[in-house]
C-alpha cells in the first residue's frame, strides 16, 4: 500500500516532490530493514548524508512513537546503544561513534521533560500545519466545484506529509538556534574586547599617573636642591663682603 501510494505521488508532483517521495520511500525501506536491528543498518541510518538534520527529531533517532512511555524509551535506548557501540563495531569505529552519540543525545533529550515537550510540540505543529493545509485545499476545491479528494486522504501519504513538515520545522529551529548562538557568541566577544580595552586603558592611566608623580617628586627635589645650593652660594658670597678692613699701622716720627 505504501509503495503504490508513493508511486502515485511521484507521478503527480513536481520535481521537488518527486525527489522527496523517492527519498521517503528509500528511508522507509531502510527502516523496514532496520526492524531486524542490525548494527550495520543502524549505523548506516544514523550517519547517512543529511543525518545532522534527520537526527534532530529524537523520536526518529530512536525509531519510537511520540506516545511511548519513558520505560519504553529506556528499553529502546539500551537496544540501539548496544548495537552501535564503537567497541562492538571496531571495523567501523568512527561511524559507530557518531551513531552512538546520536542515540545517546536523543535519549538524554527525551529524559529531559522540558526538551521532550519541545520536541512533541514541533511534531504537533507539523501535524497541525498539514491538517490546515489539507483543509484549505479542500475548501478551495469545493469553491471551484471540483472533487475535494486530495492525496493526503491516504493515511500513508498523510504521514509522509507530516514527516516532511516536521523534519522541516526541526531544521528551521536548529538553524535559528545556531544563528542565535553565533549572535550571542559575537556579543560576548564584543563585551570581552571592551572589558580588555577598559582594563588596558585603566592600566595605562595608572602607569601615567605613577610616572607623573615620580617625575614630579624628582622635579621638586631638584628644585629644592637648586634652591639650597643657590642659598649656600649667596651666604658664602655675603660672608666675603663682610670681612673687616685691614688696620693700617700708624708710623711715628
Swiss-Prot record:
**Predominant location:** nucleus
- State any GO CC term: cytosol
- Keyword Transmembrane helix applies: no
- Gene Ontology molecular function: Hsp70 protein binding
Q: Name one Pfam family in it.
A: DnaJ
Modification N-acetylalanine, positions: 2
Question: Compositional bias (Basic residues) at which positions?
Answer: 231-240
The record's region (Essential for polyglutamine aggregation suppression) falls at 232-253
Where along the chain is composition biased (Basic and acidic residues)? 181-222
Where, per the database record, does this protein carry Phosphoserine? 35, 222
Q: Please describe the quaternary structure of this protein.
A: Interacts with SRPK1. Interacts with HSP70 (HSPA1A or HSPA1B).
What is this protein's name? DnaJ homolog subfamily C member 8
Coding gene? Dnajc8
